[in-house]
């Protein structure tokens, strides 16, 4: 699974999407 995309989205707030 892509790390940062779905993992801990509450904490990272989608760093890869932003």
From Swiss-Prot:
Top-level taxon: Eukaryota
PROSITE patterns: ALPHA_2_MACROGLOBULIN
Compartments reported by the entry: Secreted
GO cellular component: extracellular region
Functional description taken from the UniProt entry: Is able to inhibit all four classes of proteinases by a unique 'trapping' mechanism. This protein has a peptide stretch, called the 'bait region' which contains specific cleavage sites for different proteinases. When a proteinase cleaves the bait region, a conformational change is induced in the protein which traps the proteinase. The entrapped enzyme remains active against low molecular weight substrates (activity against high molecular weight substrates is greatly reduced).
Assembly description: Homodimer; disulfide-linked.
Family: Belongs to the protease inhibitor I39 (alpha-2-macroglobulin) family.
Protein name: Alpha-2-macroglobulin homolog
Organism: Octopus vulgaris
